[in-house]
Amino acid sequence: MAELTISASDIEGAIEDYVSSFTADSGREEIGVVIDAGDGIAHVEGLPSVMTQELLEFPGGVLGVALNLDEHSVGAVILGEFEKIEQGQQVKRTGEVLSVPVGDAFLGRVINPLGQPIDGQGDIEAEGRRALELQAPSVVQRQGVSEPLQTGIKAIDSMTPIGRGQRQLIIGDRKTGKTAVCVDTILNQREAWATGDPKQQVRCVYVAIGQKGTTIASVKRALEEGGAMECTTIVAAPASDAAGFKWLAPYTGSAIGQHWMYDGKHVLIVFDDLSKQADAYRAISLLLRRPPGREAFPGDVFYLHSRLLERCAKLSDELGGGSMTGLPIIETKANDISAFIPTNVISITDGQCFLESDLFNQGVRPAINVGVSVSRVGGAAQIKAMKEVAGSLRLELSQYRELEAFAAFASDLDAASKAQLDRGARLVELLKQPQYTPYPVEDQVVAIYLGTGGHLDSVPVEDVARFESELLEHVKASHGDILAGIRESKKLSEEAEQKLANVINEFKKGFSASDGSSVVVNEAEAEAMDEADVEKESVKVRKPAPKK
């Protein structure tokens, strides 16, 4: 057995070799100290070089965002569990701003505002990351709104049309159907998605801010049952989340949508709702001791929404021609659209659909108030067929509402006013639509033509919905070429209009009202004049008596 010998010179040489090859890793790291924490906010002393909106790392891997940069301290919003953060704990800079993972793998998934999946379906393979705070496209990077985004809702597509790249505000009191309008719009994109054509496909992002967990679950279930979840991403910041998550959720959804928009694709994003984001931002600002303004909101609450909604755009052809259409939702109180946040968002967006609680309670659903609702740029994107048949719809409905209020006090009305009231009542009934039943645009054109063309004037009001549905089934079954022509050419030619009128008149002959009566009007023929009376003067002129 060989003896183990230890040579002092060998040991000395090994140590010298190690010391000569050793390089000390020296680095400079800024560390701050928590001086107070609570309610999702922490004040940190130190960190003199921290950037605004920079991510900070708290003990336990909890992240925060630096918002207030004071002379000796930093005010940060905690993203996550803030109960374990205590005074005296160390805080590190990350040198990064907040970003989220993006990509097609997010379709069909539910994520939180940090981009982490919360639906229990495993991890998501992202294509890259995108910063939450990015500059909106400039004027030269945009083009005008020219392509329609069909909502499937007759009242919107006919009177307040929405184009790709537009921001259309959905505003109204609680429980007036605002979320239902947006969910129906998402459901209406499923047929375009099924075509596989990138020019027609629309990817949808639904951002739930401060909603109840059951409400978010019901929206997800409705999208799954309607077959639209495969083209939708849900960003959820429920009411139980901290204010920081509710503040960031819309920017997360916008970043995911912008990734697709700059890739030449079309996106629809729903913010449900921005009132709760403003409330969360107000809470954060007050806790950070920022000076309050009107309704206790901070001075930059307008910028909070403007920099978010300006990201919705129709990009120029040089940048791929992609688009992101925004449907922000705002909740009013007692139908007051002159409050601070509603007026802010109205001034930022390209139009609004005002849902009224009185109409909703009367059974008019969707409860859109035609007089206040408007689309400033969507008219350029409306198809010609719809423009032709719906041109007089808004005016007739507005006159009907005015006459309706007047008729409540008038005992006797002339025949023209009565006819206008009868026509208006049938138009209101025609525009009613059940939830989760979006209409294809060609069906909408036929339905609106029924009302504005006077074909419903002889149909009792209570039978309008049945007449419309049975006629559409008849046209689809026996005259599908009319619908196909509208769908392909986007026009209603004179020949097609005449054929449609004949089909409606023939259908009326076989349709019976609920009381069993016919809806065909038999106009009495005028009696022919005798030839001997044609040249006879029938007007007697009485000369005034001569003055005395």
UniProtKB/Swiss-Prot annotation:
Its main location: membrane. The record marks 373 as: Required for activity. Pfam families: ATP-synt_ab, ATP-synt_ab_C, ATP-synt_ab_N. It is an enzyme of class 7 (translocase). It catalyses: ATP + H2O + 4 H(+)(in) = ADP + phosphate + 5 H(+)(out). Disulfide bonds: none annotated. GO terms for molecular function: ADP binding; ATP binding; proton-transporting ATP synthase activity, rotational mechanism. SUPFAM superfamilies: C-terminal domain of alpha and beta subunits of F1 ATP synthase (SSF47917), N-terminal domain of alpha and beta subunits of F1 ATP synthase (SSF50615), P-loop containing nucleoside triphosphate hydrolases (SSF52540). The keyword Membrane applies. ATP binds at residues 172-179. Signal peptide: none annotated. Gene3D superfamilies: 2.40.30.20, ATP synthase alpha/beta chain, C-terminal domain, P-loop containing nucleotide triphosphate hydrolases. It is a peripheral membrane protein. Residues 526-548 are annotated as: Disordered. F-type ATPases have 2 components, CF(1) - the catalytic core - and CF(0) - the membrane proton channel. CF(1) has five subunits: alpha(3), beta(3), gamma(1), delta(1), epsilon(1). CF(0) has three main subunits: a(1), b(2) and c(9-12). The alpha and beta chains form an alternating ring which encloses part of the gamma chain. CF(1) is attached to CF(0) by a central stalk formed by the gamma and epsilon chains, while a peripheral stalk is formed by the delta and b chains. This is ATP synthase subunit alpha. The gene is atpA.
